[in-house]
Amino acid sequence: MRPSDVYPEGAEFGFELLVCRWAEAAWPPDGGSDGDAVIVARQLGTKRRRWDTVVVECDPAGLAARARFGDRELDSDLLHVVRHAPAEWAWYRDALPHPGYPWRYVRAAVHRAAGRGVVEKRRRNNRIEIRRVAPYPDWVRRIVAVENKPDLDASAARALSDQLARDVDTALADEVWVATAATGGRVEPALLEDVPVEVGILAFAFDADAPGDAWADATVEWHPSDVTPADAESDEERTTTRLELAERAYGAGWRSYHDTMRPDCRHFELRRYGRALVPHCAAKGGPQTAAECAGSCPDFEPEPPVWRTGGWPVEGGPGKGIQSLLRDRREWVRRREYPETGDADAGEN
């Protein structure tokens, strides 16, 4: 399979998935590592800015401790409860800092948190008291943002330049990169475009037939600057926003693209590309984007029930096989990142 079979004519979706899979297995780009674990997510950000790929560099022990709170994201309301829950029983209004909005919303978050088992709750003297199940760990070390532009020509660079400059100025991410497809020239065209000097440039060459890790060759064409502000430690708003972002990455990962596609279509397939599994449409005879893979697609056909029959009644539902496979891959990666789980099979994806 050629790269053009995954991201034809510079299409970003397939390129983005390959970059995510590479980052999951090989981050950081320079090959050096401080022993960080990594979580990779895609299409993640804030109300004002969304990044193509987000890499969360984590403390391995902290990431393992984060697992105590489950596999799902803790949203901002739950984080407010879990981070400040006391070691001993206390009325929730005494235990938690004022949120800046009515306490009834905090009370609802307390009930949700207790329902998920991330805090303990009891009623005493007609008051709701809470107690933590474990200290919420300091598990996030750095957040890296990556913009994926397989065809970074002059017009694409101009459109992206202002966004990258804002990323550098706001410094919500500690490091910003642009990922592009390698051309094989002596000087990659991306180096000649209008990209802020603080932004790193990664050039990728993918080869599905190459053995092992050689399927993805990432070359650092320009090293980024660390844009972490000097007062980062004392900036509580920045810390909270980054933690919310990291929690969304933890809950979603990058394989959640099936949530915006139609894996319940009989034409939806996953095909191996190197060490990645990428979507493929049998009706089109090639890759599909999330926008194309929708119920409005003229080639959409429901998955035949016989495909998921294991006796009677039918097990699961339409598209559950695809979703289960992607979920299993994600859980394998999570186990690999936890220090107490031991070695994992390098052939997984």
What are these regions (language model features)?
Residues 51-160, 177:
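Conserved catalytic cores of phosphodiester-cleaving nucleases, focusing on short active-site segments
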Residues 1-21:
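A short, highly charged nucleic-acid-interacting micro-segment common to nuclease
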